[in-house]
Amino acid sequence: MLNVGDYVGQINKDSSGVWKLYKDKINKITTTKKYGRRYFTKTVFYPLDADDVDNNTKDMEESIGKGYIIVREVFRLNDKTEPYAERWIKWANENPDKATGLI
């Protein structure tokens, strides 16, 4: 479970095909009957389903050192996930032939 002020990120390719880590800060958390718990960021991401982000964060932390990484999904940036994502992005941009076809 995240709090206001925590950062979330997503690994994705930009328009030129370069892998990047898109980051934003959670500035609001709401809970409603219709949508459940959601995280809001100021600019980068639309309202995010909190359970999805929490599960993606858990999956990302569990993937460390196991040879895979989660891309195109939003996860919490913390002292484990952010350096792991940044190392993978550096590797993927240096080895684009090996990073193709990843999901």
Model-derived features with residue positions:
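Short coil-to-beta transition motif at edge beta-strands of beta-rich domains
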Residues: 1-13
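Short beta-strand-centered aromatic/proline hotspots
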Residues: 17-31
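Short, solvent-exposed loop/turn segments that connect beta-strands within catalytic domains
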Residues: 14-19, 34-38
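Intrinsically disordered, low-complexity, charged/polar segments
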Residues: 43-103
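Short, solvent-exposed secondary-structure boundary/capping segments
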Residues: 30-45
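Intrinsic-disorder-associated interaction segments
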Residues: 1, 15, 19, 64, ...
